[in-house]
Amino acid sequence: MAHAPARCPSARGSGDGEMGKPRNVALITGITGQDGSYLAEFLLEKGYEVHGIVRRSSSFNTGRIEHLYKNPQAHIEGNMKLHYGDLTDSTCLVKIINEVKPTEIYNLGAQSHVKISFDLAEYTADVDGVGTLRLLDAVKTCGLINSVKFYQASTSELYGKVQEIPQKETTPFYPRSPYGAAKLYAYWIVVNFREAYNLFAVNGILFNHESPRRGANFVTRKISRSVAKIYLGQLECFSLGNLDAKRDWGHAKDYVEAMWLMLQNDEPEDFVIATGEVHSVREFVEKSFLHIGKTIVWEGKNENEVGRCKETGKVHVTVDLKYYRPTEVDFLQGDCTKAKQKLNWKPRVAFDELVREMVHADVELMRTNPNA
């Protein structure tokens, strides 16, 4: 029986730099996204050299990381360096990994919108599923199996039609979308590389995490933006889908710390990262409006339900069936006991504080740039 090669005691310590300092070089896919930008900030503060893979687009898509350039006006790089690449192109991944020789890889790049994955099912599978395999294979091709640690952004959408409440690392998966199914393949191929090649590879099963940097087509950010516009008189009403969907919402800033902690653990293990608290979309709406001094009262049922302002009588929220998913995920609640015990991690930002931060940030943004 063939034996797996021995794993380095610390992949981070490989290739010591000057004066015997450990070489801390991170490669982040999805660096321009919400999580990627917070993770880049976090790692730069820890003294890492950070490399990010960005897709080429006709307009700059680096808004969330502009401030991390040495000279943001001239896009002059300091300890953060960007490389054009794509998870659908294995050649470029091999080239970048061979050039950078990272000690830690964080695979955050994905088509991450669940509803859109029903329209872009094949693309989602290619990027989120096979893209993860391409990245892992690139590590193997470059001979870095024993000197790199690999973090895979897994998701609570793996649980989908939940088999137990709350969901933990041992809960059976039942994805309910092309996104969830693609991420399920990614989850298992990471486990396979860990077991077959002794790669230090982990899955972070992250429950919903939000921030002012959340993409505008995600429900929480759609709510905070719309509420800000209503407060500023730029909008009167907006539409949502399933108001009673319940989620475990945390702050992205807390969750990127958990990603890093997983790679500092002695052994590669998968972890659920969550708050353990559940709130509905309806509740997110109500709390958002309270932050601009409005009380929402609900009238009607199902697609005819509306949210009316108690103070003015104006309808600010309606329901539109087009925002429902073909197969809904009604309830997600994570149990992060393992992360608390083994990583000493816990969420810091409470739900109320998260909602307040998002609404206030969007009020400032919409005040200066209504079309942002």
UniProtKB/Swiss-Prot annotation:
| Sites of Phosphotyrosine modification | Y323
Q: Which cofactor does it need?
A: NADP(+)
Positions of post-translational N-acetylalanine modification: A2
User: GO cellular-component terms in the record?
Assistant: cytoplasm; cytosol; extracellular exosome
EC class of the enzyme, as a word: lyase
Q: Residues that bind NADP(+), according to the entry? A: 30-35, 55-58, 86-87, 108-112, 123, 183, 209, 214
The EC code for this enzyme is 4.2.1.47
Provide a Gene Ontology MF annotation, just one: identical protein binding
Q: What is stated about the way this protein's activity is regulated?
A: Inhibited by GDP-fucose.
What sections of the protein cross the membrane?
Answer: none
Q: Where is the active site?
A: T155, E157 (nucleophile), Y179 (nucleophile)
Kindly give the Pfam families that the UniProt entry links to this protein: GDP_Man_Dehyd
Coiled-coil region list: none
Let me know which tissues express this protein, per UniProt: Highly expressed in pancreas and small intestine. Expressed in thymus, protstate, colon, heart, placenta, liver and kidney. Expressed at low levels in spleen, testis, brain and lung.
UniProt entry keywords in alphabetical sequence: Acetylation, Lyase, NADP, Phosphoprotein
Recorded catalytic activity of this chain's protein: GDP-alpha-D-mannose = GDP-4-dehydro-alpha-D-rhamnose + H2O
Which NCBIfam families is this protein grouped with? Answer: gmd
* HAMAP family in alphabetical order: GDP_Man_dehydratase
Q: What does this protein do?
A: Catalyzes the conversion of GDP-D-mannose to GDP-4-dehydro-6-deoxy-D-mannose.
Q: Which family does it belong to?
A: Belongs to the NAD(P)-dependent epimerase/dehydratase family. GDP-mannose 4,6-dehydratase subfamily.
Query: What's the name of the protein?
Result: GDP-mannose 4,6 dehydratase
